[in-house]
Amino acid sequence: ENANTQIDQIENFITSGMDVIIVQPVDPDAIEEVCKEALDSDIEVVCWDEKMENSSFNWVIENYDLGVEIGTQAADFINEKFGDKGCEVVVLGYPQTPILLERENGILDALKEKAPNAEVVANQPAIDTTEGLNAMETILQAHPDVKVVCCIGGGGATGANEALKGTYGSEVPDDIGIFSTDLTDEAIASMQNGEFDRCVVAITGNAFVCGDVIYDLSMRYAA
């Protein structure tokens, strides 16, 4: 979550003489220079989820398009449940990171286009479960009629699910739903148990699948 931390980590990897460095940039512009140092030291640099100049190759997810799909799934749910009446919506984003801001913008644009009568009553940052829980609990106090929550990631979605369970208990209304990405174990369990997660847009699989794929690509490239 901090570009300076990533710079320090990459510098340490350079000093240690690593063969390959895999990075998911918090801020790609901020780490371009140190990644160039790695390349100049004959270290392969693999960038995941962003486009960088100073990398051996980039494995890119189109984050805006991913956000549009999350928002589209939420809009379909809104239109099915509420029609022209619309409903109150919460977005749990993370604008501190450029790629997640792109994803958030995709969600907002899709909601505006495809569910124009829905009202986004709160937009709060939530990158993990704790932030999602705290943000959603606070939002529900001010907006108890929220029906849809759109999240840029699985952590915020898990926290939102816990907050909604705290509000509604075991009675899960069929007109309330969480829409997100990241196929976490928690999201799968929520859907299997009939909780508040309605849709997870999974492009790359869970964190372990992503890790396996990017590692395999990196090793094949470096071979």
Locate each region found by the language model.
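A residue-level marker of the well-folded mature domains of exported/periplasmic proteins
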Residues: 1-223
